[in-house]
């Protein structure tokens, strides 16, 4: 019940990325003369390689598991100061540096090239030698620890009732170096994995040996989020992808367009001369970082990096973000990652003054047993998934195992989080709160054995049924992890008819989707709806309806089997039998004017879906695609079986589609979908390609906003849907608008299709079986609509204005809409 919510929060970190306890220190460095903040001051733990320079407010934050007792601040022209620390806890240490005077001889200053540029050129030139992602092969072992903490804890949290239920959790309160505020741990996870990468063949594969997450019993599902592979932060890339936001890297080939660079120091660390380079963003119209990199002078390799997200960047829900990376020469002297750390504070408000409760997420990855250039084991090459959970129950490991695999011991507080979270889950108040949250996210109110819902279909209304009431449910994984049974009943006050449906899902494999689904329903449907359309019984489809829905009663039974052969290759096979009934909104008339009560269809179908390096989150019965940088291809073929049902038709239908999301930083990204198909044979209009209209004010990316239902049909067609999201590149330059952080979108959609004479029911003397509904025609002249949208309004809403560019003339039986305003809701970083 609460597990999906915890896994969802863990996924936010995954999407990015002793008994010695952690020593954390945060503070500000100022000038003793005037009290102003000092920028570029070097702050280090003496005797270690952990250090950073202060930002424009003079702020610094450091964290280490090394045993340290002092922190030191130094800057040319100021006296160095060293102050004591209390190890193993949070320290707030401010420095006030005193300027020193020293005499120098005559200095002649001449203009010249920034001394950083030759160093950066060397880094770019040597990326093939120093970037692990460009090596032929490598393998390593990873240990990943993620923690989710609650901060800005209000006094109400310490009320008498909460103290009675949760008082013991306040023993775990600590202070964050990221924000300087107290936090309460809410979740901790650990995983250990073997990571393999190859250039030929190109793949990156993670074999998770063990994983555990506090408070989650389904460790197989959780393990997919707790690994380290997909959270990589690679400063050698031109753009660093964190939470689906592409930040310009300071080591980007075109980094000078985004950053100003300063050579602030050179030093010797572990016998190697290191250049310390500070970088600041030139502008905040695109996602950028602020921080420093340390470059090895001999190899031009990145030795370490520390960066943060500056204030004012157009990013949602993240108040603070810190990235830390450390590299060392490893196998054969090649450079490799030693440690990565991502820390982020998630909040509804991004203002520092906000007192709203927020979450701090931290993800640390330690790398060991690095092997570069060695052959990948055959067993790994044969694996059919890029994330492989070795054990069906990866969380069933004793504490002794974790003590052996950790590169450092957890603090006593960290060890206690597991027991603390398990204790919290037995508190009734907690169970009630998480049941409510889980219901909002999943759509079902889960009892132990039955989930009741979806709640958004409990009540709705439409022209055909009037007021509709629906009650449904499905079994939970407590009943079975291999079989799920669901069903619903519904009743409409206008048609006074009982409807319903049911389904049985049988999952044969968790690692790869191999699932049989049986469904049956007697219910109303909107033929010709888009793939992302609000379902007919959704309350939002009723509220946002334009009033031109044209529903049909359908009896349908279907069986579908999906077989995923390997990661990225799936086939489908199934059979369908259905009967579609006429009504006053969707009449059925023969060419001689004789009405028809219904049409029948029986068909078998097969399909193929191909993707590459697609990230997929797998649950017992469902899976969620998290996207791919490569196009996704789908193919389908259907064959109608004549007389399998009384009056069913013989036909053949071939369809294909491709979806692609090219990233085009810094000017955003595009979403491109192209679909096409051909129907061979004579069929009634219900079995033609009914092009996707939109009967609501809700935006559907795979439907035409200005097109009505039953306006166009084809038996051969090609359609396209294109959006480009600029992520605020243009609006972010306007003085007043940029503070709103709105983001602009361009939209263009179109379809072209033809109808054979035997299927064209819109012409006089037609050979078709049925006449078309009034106003429905072929789209032999392409239909095109285009417009623009503004998203990120209040960080949630999007408004699109769409114009119909063709087929603008009135039609008999159709109210043509040449302009549409659509609303939608998007939760994006």
Report each predicted region and the residues it spans.
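Short, ordered, surface-exposed loop/turn motifs in non-cytosolic proteins
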Residues: 23-25, 32-47, 66
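Extracellular beta-sheet/turn segments enriched in Thr/Pro/Gly and aliphatic residues
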Residues: 85-111
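Structured extracytoplasmic
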Residues: 101-102, 106, 110-274, 280-288, ...
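A short, amphipathic beta-strand motif
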Residues: 23-31, 58, 95
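A short, solvent-exposed loop/turn motif at the edges and junctions
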Residues: 45-47, 70-83
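Exposed, low-structure sequence patches enriched in small/polar residues
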Residues: 382-829
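Short, acidic Ser/Thr/Gly-rich low-complexity loop/linker segments typical of extracellular
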Residues: 48-59
């Amino acid at each position: 019940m609460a597990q999906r919510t915890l896994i969802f929060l863990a996924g936010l970190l995954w999407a990015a990325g002793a008994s010695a306890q952690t020593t954390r220190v945060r503070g500000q460095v100022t000038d003793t003369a005037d009290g102003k903040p000092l920028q570029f001051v070097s702050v280090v733990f003496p005797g270690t390689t952990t250090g950073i320079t202060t930002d424009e407010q003079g702020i610094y934050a450091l964290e280490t598991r090394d045993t340290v007792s002092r922190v030191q601040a130094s800057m040319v022209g100021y006296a160095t100061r060293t102050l004591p620390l209390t190890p193993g806890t949070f320290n707030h240490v401010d420095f006030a540096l005193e300027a020193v005077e020293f005499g120098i001889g005559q200095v002649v200053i001449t203009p010249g090239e920034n001394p950083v540029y030759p160093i950066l050129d060397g880094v770019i030139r040597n990326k093939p030698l120093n970037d692990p992602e460009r090596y032929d092969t490598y393998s390593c072992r990873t240990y990943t620890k993620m923690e989710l903490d609650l901060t800005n804890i209000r006094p109400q949290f310490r009320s008498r009732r909460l103290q009675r239920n949760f008082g013991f959790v306040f023993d775990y309160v600590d202070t964050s170096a990221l924000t300087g505020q107290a936090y309460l741990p809410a979740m901790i996870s650990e995983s250990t994995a073997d990571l393999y990468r190859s250039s030929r063949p190109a793949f990156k594969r993670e074999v998770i040996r063990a994983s555990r997450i506090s408070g989650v019993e389904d460790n197989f599902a959780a393990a997919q989020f707790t690994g380290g592979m997909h959270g990589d932060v690679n400063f050698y890339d031109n753009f660093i992808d964190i939470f689906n936001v592409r930040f310009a890297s300071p080591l980007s080939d075109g980094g000078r367009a985004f950053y100003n660079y300063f050579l602030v120091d050179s030093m010797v660390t572990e016998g190697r001369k290191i250049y310390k380079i500070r970088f600041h963003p030139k502008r905040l119209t695109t996602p950028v970082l602020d921080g420093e990199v340390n470059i090895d002078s001999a190899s031009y390799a990145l030795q370490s990096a520390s960066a943060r997200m500056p204030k004012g960047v157009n990013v949602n829900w993240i108040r603070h973000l810190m990235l830390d990376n450390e590299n060392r020469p490893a196998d054969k002297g090649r450079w490799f990652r030693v440690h990565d750390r991502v820390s982020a504070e998630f909040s509804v408000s991004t203002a520092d003054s906000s007192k709203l409760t927020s979450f701090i997420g931290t993800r640390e990855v330690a790398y060991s047993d690095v092997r570069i250039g060695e052959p990948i084991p055959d067993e790994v090459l044969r694996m059919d998934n890029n994330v492989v959970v070795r054990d069906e129950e990866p969380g069933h490991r004793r504490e002794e195992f974790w003590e052996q695999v950790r590169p450092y011991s957890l603090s006593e507080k960290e060890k206690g989080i597991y027991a603390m979270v398990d204790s919290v889950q037995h508190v009734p108040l907690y169970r009630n709160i998480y049941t409510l949250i889980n219901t909002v996210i999943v759509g079902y109110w889960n009892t132990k054995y039955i989930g009741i819902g979806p709640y958004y279909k409990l009540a709705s209304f439409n022209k055909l049924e009037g007021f509709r009431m629906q009650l449904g449910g499905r079994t939970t994984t407590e009943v079975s992890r291999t079989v799920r049974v669901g069903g619903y009943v519904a009743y409409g006050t206008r048609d006074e008819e009982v409807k319903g449906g049911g389904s049985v899902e049988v999952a044969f494999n968790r690692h790869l989707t191999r699932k049989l689904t049986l469904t049956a329903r007697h219910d109303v449907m909107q033929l010709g709806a888009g793939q992302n359309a609000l379902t007919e019984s959704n309350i939002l489809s009723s509220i946002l309806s334009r009033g031109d829905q044209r529903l049909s009663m359908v009896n349908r039974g279907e069986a579908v089997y999906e077989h995923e052969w390997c990661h990225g290759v799936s086939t489908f096979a199934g059979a369908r039998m259905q009967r579609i009934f006429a009504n006053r909104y969707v009449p059925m008339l023969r060419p001689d004017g004789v009405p028809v009560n219904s049409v029948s269809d029986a068909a078998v179908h097969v399909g193929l879906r191909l993707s590459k390096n697609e990230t997929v989150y797998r649950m017992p019965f469902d899976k969620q695609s998290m996207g791919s940088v490569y196009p996704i291809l789908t193919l389908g073929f259907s064959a109608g079986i004549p007389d399998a049902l009384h009056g069913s038709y013989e036909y053949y239908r071939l369809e294909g589609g491709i979806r692609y999301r090219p990233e085009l930083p810094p000017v955003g990204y595009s979403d491109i979908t192209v679909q096409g198909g051909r129907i061979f044979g004579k069929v009634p209009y219900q079995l033609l390609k009914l092009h996707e209209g939109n009967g609501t004010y809700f935006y559907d990316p795979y439907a035409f906003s200005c097109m009505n239902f039953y306006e166009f049909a084809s038996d051969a067609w090609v359609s396209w849907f294109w959006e480009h999201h600029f992520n605020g590149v243009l609006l972010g330059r306007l003085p007043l608008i940029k503070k709103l952080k709105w983001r602009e979108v361009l939209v263009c959609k179109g379809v072209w299709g033809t109808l054979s004479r035997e299927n064209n029911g819109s012409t006089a003397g037609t050979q078709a079986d049925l006449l078309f509904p009034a106003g429905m025609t072929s789209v032999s002249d392409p239909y095109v609509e285009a417009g623009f949208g503004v998203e990120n309004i209040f960080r949630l809403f999007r408004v699109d204005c769409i114009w119909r560019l063709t087929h603008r003339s009135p039609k008999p039986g159709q109210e043509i809409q040449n302009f549409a305003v659509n609303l939608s809701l998007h939760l994006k970083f």
